[in-house]
Amino acid sequence: MMKLRVLTLGILIILLITACSAPTPTTPAAAPTAAPAPNAQPTLQQVTLAMSYIPNIQFAPYYVAAAKGYYAAEGIEVVFDYNFENDVLQRAATWPTSGVAFATTSGTSVLLARQQGLPVKTVMTLYQRFPIAFFAKSNVPLASVNDLRGQTIGIPGRFGESFYALLAALYAGGMSEADVTVQEIGFTQTAAVMEDKVPVAIGYAMNEPVQLRGQGVEVNVLLAADVFNLAANGIAVSEALIAQNPELVRKFVRASLRGLADTLANPDEAFDLSLQFIPEAQLGDLSLQRQVLQESLPFWQNELTAQYGLGYTDGQLWTRTEEFMRAAGLLSAPVDVQQAFTNEFVPGGSY
C-alpha cells in the first residue's frame, strides 16, 4: 500500500513538471529575429547660399524651401550666409575655393561682374520687376517720370539699386542729373520724407512706403519698373559649377521654386515658417513685416512666369538693361547678355 502511494505521488510530480514545461498552445513561440536597424538617414550635401542682405522676410521663398524639406528632398542642406552684394558675387565666382555655390544678386550686378571678368551667371530670377520705387507724401505729385523734373530726390548714395533706378528713370524720361537735385541721405529715406527733409526719396517698394503708411502717412509711389524696368534679383552661380555639377544647380533651383510657389499660394504660412530663420531682434513690427511680404508677391510673378514658369529670366529685359547701363556709363564696354543668364535649369525654360 505504501509503495502504491509513493508510485502515485511520483507520477503526479512528473506530470506536473511536464505540464509546466510544455508550451502554451495558444501562444506559439516566435522565431528569433535580428535587432531592428536604426533608420538610416540619407547624407545631405551641404551647400552655401550667400545672401546679399541681413536675414529678412524678402528671402521667404528660400526659407520656405528649407523649412518644408524641399532642399532635403533633393539631397542638399542649404546654409544661409549673409553678406554684401559685391562680396557674394565674388565668392560665388570663385567656387569651389570659396565654398559658396549660390548667391542672391541682381541682374545689374551680374552684368557689372561679368565686365570685370567674373564668370558668373544668373540661373533663376526671383524678382520679375525691379523692386525700387520713388515715394513722397501725398501732397507731392508723383504720377509719372515727368513729375521728377525739378525735384530734390533723396538717395542712399551714388551706388546700388536705388542709384541705378534713378539713372534709368532719367534715361527713360529724356533727362539728366542736371534736371533734378540729387541729395545723398544715407539709409534714412523714411525719416527724410516724413520730416520733409526731401520731397521725394528712393527705396524698396515693399519697404519704406510700407513703413510710412504704417505710421499713418499717406504716400504717392512711382514704381521704377513702370518707368524703366531693369534685370532684378535672382540666383547666380559660377560657370564652373554649371560645367562641373549641373545637377546640383538643377536641384537647388527646383527646390527653391517649390518654396516660391508655396509662398505665393500661402503667404501667411510662408511668413510663419520664415520667422525661424530671422533673429527676433531683426524682426521689428511683425504686422509690418507681414505687409512687406504681401507687397513683395506681385514682383515675383508676371505674364512671362505664367507662360514659362516661375524663375524665368527675360532675355529682352536683360538686353535693355545692358543697353541702358552702357548709355549711363555704368558699363564701359558691351557685355554679352546671352552669356550672363540661362533658363536651362528653370522648368518651362529652354533646355
UniProtKB/Swiss-Prot annotation:
Keywords from the UniProt entry: Cell membrane, Lipoprotein, Membrane, Palmitate, Signal
SUPFAM superfamilies referenced in this protein's UniProt entry, alphabetically:
Periplasmic binding protein-like II
One GO cellular component this record assigns the protein to is: plasma membrane
Q: Where is the lipid attached (N-palmitoyl cysteine)?
A: C20
Which domain of life does the protein's organism represent? Bacteria
Topology relative to the lipid bilayer, per the entry, is: Lipid-anchor
Q: Could you tell me what induces this protein?
A: Expression is probably regulated by riboflavin, via an FMN riboswitch.
The record ties this protein, via InterPro entries, to: NMT1/THI5, SsuA/THI5
Q: Which Pfam families match?
A: NMT1
Positions where lipid (S-diacylglycerol cysteine) attaches: C20
Q: Name one GO biological process term.
A: thiamine biosynthetic process
Compartment list: Cell membrane
Q: What are the transmembrane regions?
A: none
Per the UniProt entry, the signal peptide is 1-19
| Subunit organization | The complex is likely composed of an ATP-binding protein, a transmembrane protein (RibX) and a solute-binding protein (RibY).
Q: Its biological function?
A: Part of an ABC transporter complex that transports riboflavin into the cell. Binds riboflavin.
Give the similarity note.
Belongs to the NMT1 family.
Q: Which PANTHER family match?
A: 4-AMINO-5-HYDROXYMETHYL-2-METHYLPYRIMIDINE PHOSPHATE SYNTHASE THI11-RELATED, RIBOFLAVIN-BINDING PROTEIN RIBY
* Protein name, as recorded: Riboflavin-binding protein RibY
